[in-house]
């Protein structure tokens, strides 16, 4: 909450409202705050609407993808929020569900869709349709799994033998066998593969850079933009994009804008509030072990954008 500064009052947009913890804290910070909470998971949205009902019209729930924030504000006749927050990744409601397929702790259909009501492909659908090379590529790219080719080979071999992977247990067991035993395993061998499939199914990295630009453009002058990410791929994008909007040319990431040379669209529109990502301390990790990999980055929109030539 420190970086959002909700005590100032105004409109805040919680782009991934989940169970509403952040939204509740924003609403409690000042009687002058309002929150629009966005989520593509209708179950989470319904639970949050009930949880925050006592705030009345100060909270409004919208069933949509966080990347639709510009359209939502336009439809509602709202403009220039004081703050925008995006807490990326899987919510506790999704991860703890025994039926949604996000976790290998439960034997469930291999779904992984954040919006189970959508017509999008499930994780099982992807593994049934994609060729071996594409499965290996997505597991390596999104999961940074060094055994991606071997895992993909085993998945396709099982499919060709008339045994397609359709449940979380089947996938977790196959990955454990394919990866083989290694000493000092600190995480389950299927963790990276599950992450990769979830990212692919929900297209989590697609247009993330464009979302940053949209959010910054929507903010009022001095408005705050805060993003919490949970894996290195997201955090890398957030770091690069915030630096680009702070005027650091990504053509040469060490330099400020050189107007005649820059082709990456760098501009000085924000002040970065977090020189390094903010990570949870040991007390917070003990209270919430899932926060261990969280990284928070924040920026403040400048009152006047500084041109490339200045």
Regions found by a protein language model. Give the residues of each.
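S-adenosyl-L-methionine-dependent methyltransferase catalytic core, i.e., the SAM/SAH-binding region
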Residues: 1-310
């Amino acid at each position: 909450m420190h970086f959002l500064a909700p005590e100032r009052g105004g409109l805040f947009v919680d782009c991934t409202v989940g169970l509403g913890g952040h939204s509740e804290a924003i609403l409690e910070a000042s009687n002058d705050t309002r929150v629009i909470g966005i989520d593509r998971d209708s179950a989470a949205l319904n639970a949050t609407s009930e949880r925050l009902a006592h705030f009345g019209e100060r909270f409004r729930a919208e069933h949509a993808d966080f990347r639709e924030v510009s359209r939502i504000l336009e439809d509602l006749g709202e403009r220039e929020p004081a703050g925008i927050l995006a807490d990326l990744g899987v919510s506790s409601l999704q991860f703890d569900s025994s039926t949604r397929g996000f976790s290998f702790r439960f034997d469930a259909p291999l779904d992984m869709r954040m919006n189970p009501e959508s017509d999008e492909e499930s994780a099982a659908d992807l593994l049934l349709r994609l060729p071996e090379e594409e499965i290996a590529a997505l597991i390596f790219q999104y999961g940074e799994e060094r055994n991606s080719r071997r895992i993909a080979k085993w998945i396709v071999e099982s499919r060709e033998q008339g045994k397609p992977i359709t449940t979380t247990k089947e996938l977790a067991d196959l990955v454990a066998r394919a990866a083989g035993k290694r000493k000092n395993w600190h995480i389950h061998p299927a963790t990276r593969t599950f992450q990769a499939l979830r990212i692919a199914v929900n297209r989590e990295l697609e247009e993330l850079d464009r979302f940053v630009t949209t959010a910054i453009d929507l903010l009022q002058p001095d408005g705050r933009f805060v993003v919490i990410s949970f894996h290195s791929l997201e955090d890398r994008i957030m770091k690069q994009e915030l630096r680009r909007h702070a005027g650091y040319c990504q053509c040469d990431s060490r330099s400020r804008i050189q107007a005649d040379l820059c082709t990456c669209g760098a501009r000085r529109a924000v002040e970065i509030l977090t020189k390094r990502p903010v990570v949870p301390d040991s007390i917070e990790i003990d209270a919430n072990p899932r926060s261990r990999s969280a990284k928070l980055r924040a920026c403040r929109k400048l009152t006047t954008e500084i041109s490339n030539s200045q």
